[in-house]
Amino acid sequence: MSTNQETRGFQSEVKQLLQLMIHSLYSNKEIFLRELISNASDAADKLRFKALSVPELYEGDGDLKVRIRFDEEKGTLTISDNGIGMTRDEVIDHLGTIAKSGTKEFLSALGQDQAKDSQLIGQFGVGFYSAFIVADKVTVKTRAAGVSADKAVLWESAGEGEYSVADIDKKERGTEITLHLREDEKAFLNDWRLREIIGKYSDHIGLPVEILAKEYDDEGKETGIKWEKINKAQALWTRAKNEISEEEYQEFYKHLSHDFTDPLLWAHNKVEGNQEYTSLLYVPAKAPWDLFNREHKHGLKLYVQRVFIMDDAQVFMPNYLRFMRGLLDSNDLPLNVSREILQDNKVTSALRKALTKRALQMLEKLAKDDAEKYQRFWQEFGLVLKEGPAEDFANKETIAKLLRFASTHNDSSQQSVSLEDYVARMKEGQKAIYYITADTYVAAKNSPHLELFNKKGIEVLLLSDRIDEWMLSYLTEFDGKPLQTISKADLDLGDLADKEEDSQKAQDEQYASFVERVKTLLGERVKEVRLTHRLTDTPAVVSTGDDQMTTQMAKLFAAAGQAMPEVKYTFELNPEHGLVQKVAEIADEQQFADWIELLLEQAMLAERGSLENPVAFIKRMNTLLSKLTSH
């Protein structure tokens, strides 16, 4: 008998997700059972945790389990647990809405590519809603631990626009989900089919999964039915590594993360001594859709003495390793540990240090043993790893070895060059690791600042990620060699510099009056005007001084909404270039001014990628071109 019934509309994002999910995940539909068993396992974990402080929540029934039964006549499959259960408000919150930040953005990323959509939805984690892949109606009966039998809740929906919720009586604690299977999904109402799926997806969870099975006598006659445990029901991380198959590790990752894709790699460690803990760390194959969302949930699943404590314990991994998934089972933390206690705890600090080191070792080994696989990792998570040098001084050298960059050594935008690779190829007499930053790879590759380096065959790292300039303010050297930008006005090439000092000195004297004339014209708009001998094909460049912020750093601050002082550039002119030589001979002041302005604007455009007044630049260009073509 149900009371207080109401019909409610799904949150719009739920409706959209249900439609997309049924379409995109149809080819992998058996995962619905994994998701529902995984939820039941989580419900048991949460009850165990709450019962640490309130044992009465067990209600005399501490034997936690998941039970599965089916009814061929009715076409139903039922998954039940005796875990924490839900109240009416929790049912509405969990089954009627998606309480994830960035959900709208995620849904807008889904399109017509079914394979890509399937992967994205898998990363998002559909959980309970996966039931609608195979069912045209879902019924949920649930009672929260510690509340009376008449405070249970009935939830029903056909997975379209709305659902109903009502109060019912339910003696047993926990949640019972009944799937009314579609006509073409009745193959799931089969004992051996269910055993196969559960063995494949849920053998690793620490909770018994039981199926209602028929009993037979010695002559093969049916004598009744009984509940039969069909999984190992031993937490995977407590087992010996040599007993665990690759497939079991992969399925456990999917249970932990609700990701549908196999992980890239994992490491399972049991540590004894000053600290006693077991860790199982995974590197996903794909970056989650919300990796750069500030509210992105990350961290390890925390157990203390095999008792679940919390999801997403962020304190055990630094932020630059937030892509790592897995669990930690510690013997040294108290069972009543809270997020607040974790923040300021010596044991936590020691565990974080050890787990960070282990995660970095995993990546070091991957980079050494399988460059192609490491490149796949870098394409997904390289941007996050670049946050490391600023966050983790103690491991800065290790992180630096893991970084990858594009370079003039390769004719490719792929970031595949390590700092160790670069150092091994350095020219004799080269003292620094040279780099250039720009908005894009193409802009970096074609920067006029590269001309002298290309001429001399000196490798330069080409950096175009927004984070690069910020990262390099923390990563200033590697292997005892400074990292040096080539866009500075006072670039010192040391032993690699040209030895033609006499001819350069003569040019400086020859063009001294020209340089003064340009200085007078531009005045305070530039920091300095000088000749340069590091260009081959370009008439002029602008550069910043050693005491100034670089162009890319200024852009970074501006993008963050911070007011920054104007960058005053040094204007460098190439006396070997025919255009500069011609302009130096112009006597008419207006014509001279127009050409100098054009050269400055060109240099600014090459450096910054934009101009404050592009219309004036175009007009000036057209005027000068018209004069040239009229002769």
Swiss-Prot record:
Report the family membership: Belongs to the heat shock protein 90 family.
- What segment(s) does the record annotate as region C? 556-631
Q: Which HAMAP family match?
A: HSP90
The segment annotated B runs over 340-555
Chief location bin = cytoplasm
Q: What is this protein's gene name?
A: htpG
Its biological function?
Answer: Molecular chaperone. Has ATPase activity.
> What are the record's GO terms for cellular component?
cytoplasm
Species assigned in the record: Pasteurella multocida (strain Pm70)
Output this protein's name.
Chaperone protein HtpG
| GO terms for MF | ATP binding; ATP hydrolysis activity; ATP-dependent protein folding chaperone; unfolded protein binding
Q: Which SUPFAM superfamilies match?
A: ATPase domain of HSP90 chaperone/DNA topoisomerase II/histidine kinase (SSF55874), HSP90 C-terminal domain (SSF110942), Ribosomal protein S5 domain 2-like (SSF54211)
Please name one Pfam family that this protein belongs to.
HATPase_c_3
